[in-house]
Amino acid sequence: MSTTKVAVIGSGNIGTDLVIKLEQVAKNVEIAVLVGIDPASDGLARARRLGISTVDTGVQGLIEHPEFDDIEIIFDSTSAKAHLTNAEALRPYGKHLIDLTPAAIGPYVVPAVNLDQHLGAPDVNMVTCGGQATIPIVAAISKVTDVHYAEIVASIASKSAGPGTRANIDEFTETTAKAIEEVGGAAHGKAIIVLNPADPPLIMRDTVLALVSNPDQDAIRQSITDMVATVAAYVPGYRLKQDVQFTELGGADTVATLTGGADIGSPVWKVSVFLEVEGAAHYLPAYAGNLDIMTSAALQVAEKLAERTALEIAR
């Protein structure tokens, strides 16, 4: 099968990590152009050393690039605000956009949960790094029982957070919380991000707390174990940090402020899941699991899109 050409907009940490993945591990897609706005950026310099065409004049420079017509998929790893502008500029050209910012113009996609549901959408959103790590766990619990409330805490090394991530903290929490509900299946969702300043940096760690009623503990454990294996198939450094924990909290009134006062039955239990994500160190060191899970998930979507396009052509 011939490969599908792609472009990456954004030459920061996420964009550069994605470019290296496209060079080293992609099967059905190939990088044609890396787009940035700073001619001196490390990402553009690395791409040039790899023999990849670069543009330092933003999305307009991409549109004017001689290979633009051959490009079918465009990753945007800039910022939520920039993606709004980029998507508008690219809309007339019918390209598939994979949005790695919290802009969320299009539907949320978490490959382990709903990869096949939105492949026809012109612009799909990869939620956030914290969402990619934790929403599969919320969805795994939701398969077994109703999740009345889910809260996630994503702790990432400060050194792995570039200016785009730092500019999008509010969007991170809002987008992740919505996706916990829409993709994860929780009735109510909340997200918190922590930029850990520890030096040497620690790998990404994520906590998922879910409120459920009368849980089948063995079934929930098995569902979570199965989901971790599904995610680890494309993010090898993704794993449970310790055993899933169950804590009885009492009556529904004890958590009414979190569940909107809904009648959720008693007793209410808290399910606690602790994860860590070790990066593949394609660009930043292994502590940057937040980059790895985001770019690996986006690559999964691109590979699936390329497969679907090839099948359509073959018919």
From Swiss-Prot:
The active site is at residue 129. Its EC number is 1.2.1.10. Disulfide bonds: none annotated. GO terms for molecular function: acetaldehyde dehydrogenase (acetylating) activity; NAD binding. It catalyses: acetaldehyde + NAD(+) + CoA = acetyl-CoA + NADH + H(+). GO terms for biological process: catabolic process. Keywords: Aromatic hydrocarbons catabolism, NAD, Oxidoreductase. NAD(+) binds at residues 11-14, 160-168, 290. CDD domains: ALDH_C. SMART domains: Semialdhyde_dh (SM00859). InterPro entries: Acetaldehyde_dehydrogenase (IPR003361), Acetylaldehyde_DH_C (IPR015426), NAD(P)-bd_dom_sf (IPR036291), Semialdehyde_DH_NAD-bd (IPR000534). Belongs to the acetaldehyde dehydrogenase family. This is Acetaldehyde dehydrogenase 1. The lineage of its organism: Bacteria, Bacillati, Actinomycetota, Actinomycetes, Mycobacteriales.
